[in-house]
Amino acid sequence: MKPNTTNLRNECWDTFSIPKRSQNIKINQSTKHQRSISDFVGTAGPGRQVGNWIIKKTIGAGSMGKVKLVVNILTGEKAALKMIPFTPNNTSQTVRVQREALLGRLLRHPNICRVIDCIRTPACTYILFEYVPGGQLLEYILARGKLDEDLARSFAMQLINALVYLHKNFIVHRDLKIENVLLTQDSRQVKLIDFGLSNFYSKDDLLRTYCGSLYFAAPELLDAKPYIGPEVDVWSLGVVIYVMVCGRVPFDDVSVPMLHSKIKSGKLEFPSYISEDCCSLIAAMLNVNPRKRCSLEQAAKFPWLKKNSFCLYLPIPLTSIPSTPSIRSHVFKPPFNLKVLQLLHEHGLASIPELKHELYMAYIERKTTSLVCLYLLGVESLAPALRIPTALPPVYSRHQRHHSEILGAMDLTEKITAMQCPP
């Protein structure tokens, strides 16, 4: 049985909001960007050449706008241009667009789709993404009915790597589903997209926004309970793994109230061909009690994910929060990097003087705030020597496995040393 794609694509509820701890970061909606993709403003037709880019065709459409394939006529580079029409008095959409553009620019991970550029005009916001030609994981599964466990294992481990990278930077995705996972041309690498519902989290300040897609939503969201953040991503990934190996969603019903009831019950049924190790992992990730639900680090230790080294391909990229205090003090201290502050300001945050003040207060008080996370990600993204590759390296052999285990990733000190870029 294939997933109910109509419901999977359309089911969404509630609105997006900024958590209390981020309210001190003001949204500057009047910011104007003067960047290379400004040539696209006012154009949309296929075959239209503007500047060094030509619009080819529509490759996607979502609730906020269309996505066009564009090609650079000088380099042949392909990119995806997302066009989001401005909607008056829609603050939630404005925040969602700004957040997607900002995080896409700052995050550097081979399993996260990168934002190349962004411009906002009075009529529309244009976001230029790296082009991921393999299409949605949803369509890939539908074309095959289901995936074999070896391939599903590889995709699952890549998504775990991406989510651990986010969570180490105190970011929760909150909208993980098979439509938000793209495949590269060779269908070997996955890329996580759509960070519009993402937010920063803290154990001391629970999130209270209930958003996402119902089939992939954790039961605590349906009960309108506050949550920390990572646990809802774990649940969603458990659903994604189930869909990959079974070809259908774990909880389904034509009645929304009945669907809610099934999700809250957590009762799982597996086809007979699914391995016991795979069933054990999914059951641990789909535990209805968020306190008993396994973490991503625990999931990575399950036998199903450790069965072979095929999927253990890459250390988690450099985290924005250095684990070594001496290195952190070297990276995060006044005077703050003006290019990073300008980048944050251009993507809708506070004025540069306000950003400087908030960062200085965090430095004095030795606090890790959401703004500190953004700043350190910005420092990392603008440092060429520390950039993370976006393509997969050759598959590691078993004797190299310890270099790519999810719990054995290098910390900042080791990464800098390995790249011969002393702090």
UniProtKB/Swiss-Prot annotation:
Keywords on record: ATP-binding, Cytoplasm, Kinase, Nucleotide-binding, Phosphoprotein, Serine/threonine-protein kinase, Transferase
Catalysed conversion reaction: L-seryl-[protein] + ATP = O-phospho-L-seryl-[protein] + ADP + H(+); L-threonyl-[protein] + ATP = O-phospho-L-threonyl-[protein] + ADP + H(+)
GO annotation, cellular component aspect: cytoplasm; cytosol
Disulfides per UniProt: none
Record-level Gene Ontology MF annotations: ATP binding; protein serine kinase activity; protein serine/threonine kinase activity
Residues that span the membrane, as ranges: none
SUPFAM superfamilies membership: Protein kinase-like (PK-like)
PTM sites of type Phosphoserine: 36, 38
Domain of life: Eukaryota
Keyword ATP-binding in record: yes
Compartments, record wording: Cytoplasm
CDD domains: STKc_Kin1_2
Pfam assignment, any one: Pkinase
Enzyme Commission numbers on file: 2.7.11.1
Active-site residue list: 175 (proton acceptor)
Protein kinase domain location: 53-305
One record GO biological process: signal transduction
Binding site for ATP: 59-67, 82
Family statement drawn from the similarity comment of this UniProt entry: Belongs to the protein kinase superfamily. Ser/Thr protein kinase family.
PANTHER family: KP78A-RELATED, MAP/MICROTUBULE AFFINITY-REGULATING KINASE
Annotated protein name in UniProt: Serine/threonine-protein kinase ppk25
Species this protein is from: Schizosaccharomyces pombe (strain 972 / ATCC 24843) (Fission yeast)
Gene this protein is translated from: ppk25
